[in-house]
């Protein structure tokens, strides 16, 4: 299916894994390791979809979502967070309130993220917002 995806995450290993998964699925990928760079790249590259972590140094994902939703044609957004079960769920709920099209709790399967992304770009939701899992790989 493809499309252009901007991935924003301060975890270099996860950023690499997500980039590879999207590239293998036929997406063009732009990556940023913090919210400030992500906002700048979103403006320069006009992605179809932004996948952003919530808890990051510099500008958090919440700030990035706010900024990206203020442009004339905002991208679709998937917010991800692994900030503990209760706190992570609060962050994801707030991200949804601010305009994230979908949310996904860490840990997640890359195939799940790619499938959700394809659905969001196509204009639907893969499934109701995903709540934190109780076990890795769940």
Regions inferred by a protein language model and the residue ranges of each:
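Receiver (REC) domain active-site loop signature in two-component systems and cognate sites
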Residues: 56
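Acidic catalytic/metal-coordinating carboxylates
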Residues: 33-37, 60-63
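Short amphipathic alpha-helix used as the core "switch/output" element in two-component signaling
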Residues: 40, 62-74
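Short hydrophobic/Thr-rich beta-strand motif most characteristic of the beta2 strand and flanking loop
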Residues: 26-33, 41
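Active-site residues of response regulator receiver
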Residues: 53
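Charged docking surfaces used in two-component/phosphorelay signaling
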Residues: 16-24
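Hydrophobic/aromatic residues positioned on beta-strands within the core alpha/beta folds
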Residues: 80-82
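Alpha4 helix (beta4-alpha4-beta5 surface) of REC/receiver domains from two-component response regulators
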Residues: 63, 84-104, 111, 115
